[in-house]
């Protein structure tokens, strides 16, 4: 193995000089000898004269010029397979949960080619989440990609935790969770939530938190994806959760700036679309198995036209948009039923009844939205009888779209509910048809099935 020496350190960027005939390839991993903790560098550029520019995967504090660096002659490799289940790992696949070493079956490089066109497969099967608003308005496809879009504090992580809990228990498959640049506290909560729900032994957790250097946050999504690809290639249906794709983009922006590239729109890296494509094109289903991915996407300043969320939109099958306005009404999950969409919401896929109910719910809510201005200026009394009925049903539908979560029982004080798709469609169809016009709207708030709303109305 060739060895070189550090000639320059600027924050997370480290320049290493190698002999002219042994220059490492781009994306090769290098290990620093003599660093206080294990430190791996990834080659990003060859500058000529035997010098390579690298990004550090850990803190570069304490590095000095002249330190010896070994070329490992392969990209970063991480353990894959069943031994990773129930464990928390970092970007290098090293365990960080104090439970001893991972019994490695094999290691795969994190940089891999996307499957070829001939190997790809698509599925029309629906993945039932047990969350009414998602199953009704933006159904998830097995092997599809779902984005949870929302600004700060509207519930992306809580929604994701609920999805993992529901799908892991009801779906009994394996899941991989990649925490990309999120809070360490959330990672901790997440771990304990998985333990309490008894699903930890079905989940591999890979964390690269907010306090990590940008190189680490840029690569941790690929580490999680590589583990998911292994399960897929064994013929399984695996779930990949990424929280948060925006931090992946942001890490790319930081790395790009550190490497001296010219920024593009809003200061993002010029390679934004390509970097997003490299990740997203690998998250796909083949003839052997499927990867269904759920990705949280932070929306800066609630602006969906920002280049980062806008680039992500293009890759998704379903988009779940979380709205601050709905959250402010106390309706959780704060999904905007008029802004959320799914490619699966087609009568040929979900059936005519589901399609009609979903579109009916949307049209009633849309009409209510239009009438809000009139109500604000003139009051309810000025509306026609038909419009009064629309408003009354819309407010019931709005409340019935809320639901108590298992992972939020501590906050809501009510037990979580898993609602089957059949019950969801039946409930909304009943409200639209006027079967429950006599019930007060409070009865529909934070309940599971329509029967629970009827029971709640008796107590009011």
UniProtKB/Swiss-Prot annotation:
Matches recorded under SUPFAM superfamilies: C-terminal domain of alpha and beta subunits of F1 ATP synthase, N-terminal domain of alpha and beta subunits of F1 ATP synthase, P-loop containing nucleoside triphosphate hydrolases
Recorded superkingdom: Bacteria
Q: Which residues bind ATP?
A: 150-157
- Pfam families assigned to the protein according to its UniProt record, in alphabetical order: ATP-synt_ab, ATP-synt_ab_N, ATP-synt_VA_C
* Top EC category: translocase
Would the keyword Nucleotide-binding be found if you checked this record's keyword annotation?
Answer: yes
Q: Which UniProt keywords apply?
A: ATP synthesis, ATP-binding, Cell inner membrane, Cell membrane, CF(1), Hydrogen ion transport, Ion transport, Membrane, Nucleotide-binding, Translocase, Transport
Gene3D superfamilies (UniProt xref): 2.40.10.170, Bovine Mitochondrial F1-atpase, Atp Synthase Beta Chain, Chain D, domain 3 (1.10.1140.10), P-loop containing nucleotide triphosphate hydrolases (3.40.50.300)
Q: What is its EC number?
A: 7.1.2.2
**Which molecular function GO terms apply here?**
ATP binding; ATP hydrolysis activity; proton-transporting ATP synthase activity, rotational mechanism
**GO CC term (a single one):** proton-transporting ATP synthase complex
Membrane topology, from the record: Peripheral membrane protein
Q: Which residue ranges run through the membrane? A: none
Name the SMART domains for this protein.
AAA
Q: Which reaction(s) does its UniProt entry say it catalyses?
A: ATP + H2O + 4 H(+)(in) = ADP + phosphate + 5 H(+)(out)
Where in the cell does this protein reside?
Cell inner membrane
Entry-linked InterPro entries = AAA+_ATPase, ATP-synt_VA_C, ATP_synth_F1_bsu, ATPase_a/bsu_AS, ATPase_alpha/beta_chains, ATPase_F1/V1/A1_a/bsu_N, ATPase_F1/V1/A1_a/bsu_N_sf, ATPase_F1/V1/A1_a/bsu_nucl-bd
**Subunit annotation:** F-type ATPases have 2 components, CF(1) - the catalytic core - and CF(0) - the membrane proton channel. CF(1) has five subunits: alpha(3), beta(3), gamma(1), delta(1), epsilon(1). CF(0) has three main subunits: a(1), b(2) and c(9-12). The alpha and beta chains form an alternating ring which encloses part of the gamma chain. CF(1) is attached to CF(0) by a central stalk formed by the gamma and epsilon chains, while a peripheral stalk is formed by the delta and b chains.
Record family assignment:
Belongs to the ATPase alpha/beta chains family.
Q: What does this protein do?
A: Produces ATP from ADP in the presence of a proton gradient across the membrane. The catalytic sites are hosted primarily by the beta subunits.
The name this protein carries in UniProt is: ATP synthase subunit beta
